[in-house]
Amino acid sequence: MGNVPTKLEEPQNPSSRLKSSSFSNSVSGNSDITDSPGSGNGRSSSQTKLNNARSKKKNASLSNGLLKSTTISSRKKDQLDREQFKEDHAAELLVKYYESVDGGFLAPFGCYSLEKLNYNPKIVKKLIIERKLAPFYTPLQDFNDNWTDEELIKIIDGLPLHASFNESLEEFEDIPTGDLKSKDFDYLIDSSSLSKREQKKLHSKIFKARLHKKRIAWQEMENTYFLEKKLSNKNILSKSKDSSEDMNNHISNSSNDILNNIDISLPNDDLKLSLYQSGIECPICFLYYPKNLNYSKCCQQPICTECFVQIKRALPHFPHDDNEHNNEDDSEKDPHLLISEPANCPYCATPNFTISYSPIASRKTGINGVKQFYYKPPKANDDANLSNNTAKPVYLTSDTIRPDWEDKLNKERSRLQRRAANATAIHVSNQLISPGRSENNEIPSNLKELENQMIEQAIKLSLQDRKQNESGSRKKSSK
């Protein structure tokens, strides 16, 4: 046995040392052998403990590095997902001339900035296609009842598909954008001279600038396509010297070269006149639209769809009490008291603003209707010219197009709960390390009290999270 320690110290391989350590411990019958002078087993045990400590430290370092790498990778993925969501949202707001309903479109003209168009575009498009919400009409800057039909058609033909963009916004000045076709733009950020916070801030600015340029490029492509088709239709009709009414008589002739080259997604002159001969002003944006807009349920005031999608609930806040004169900080209030009030009518301030829309049955063109080029105006005594008033009216609110308002409210409540928990932890920590404790007999009781506070806070947060999870599960199962 005298040669055993010498053999245990020779291997440089950590695994060999671990095996030798196991052998030594099994021989001794105790893993915690006390070192003693002249004891070979003592030296072996010390070396084994040192090797084990080094191995544990190395494994811990590797685990921490892997965990940190996984966390960074997860954050990067979340960031990419958020950016992709914003790009997809912007793409849903493109106006496409062939996506038309009753003479209007599925996307806004562009009276408001992208930041204000934070409604759910898929829901809005579905409502427009189902004729429950007025389409996004192209507005007129002015309207005159004395315009002749020729003058009105000329004005309508000159309308763009989308409002012009401000290509040189001040907030994006001197912000590099790089190659817009490439998803990666981290090479534009100098990581050697900027702090992590500055890098994150610059990344956000670059993404916004890139998205702004992408929106311009995407919409310009649609605008160009629209103008080309509109010019092509005009040239074909002028060469044939046929009116749109004569052209409709040739529909049954499939061999007609003129019809084969006409884009029937574009409106004919009859539809243009039907839409804009009786223009009406939206009291909010002061632009003129076809008369059959949305109307408020409370005071029967018109409102265009582009203005309606701007109206939303107030941000989560604590109830206002006029009789309350204290200056209590919001962080000290119960997060469950947070509320998100429905929007009021912009005209008469009636709570829970609601609108209704009555489509004109004879003007059912575009998606799920007659092609716009084939539209025929109804006769004077045609019942189809009347609005579809026999149907039960459908009422919509801002919650209809923003169904995630409750999720946002719960997120804000959770944020305040975490903030309160952090404040409690800091307060407890400060009490633990605060100087000036002269009476030692107070320390145990204070520590116990603080420990109880922390346990109560942890239980409270756990119960709140459980309630939220159960509520979310019930909603998903009900859907």
From Swiss-Prot:
Residues 1-62 are annotated as: Disordered. Coiled coil: none annotated. Residues 32-53 have a biased composition (Polar residues). GO terms for cellular component: cytoplasm. It comes from the Eukaryota. Its main location: cytoplasm. May negatively regulate the SNF1 kinase. Belongs to the SIP5 family. This is Protein SIP5.
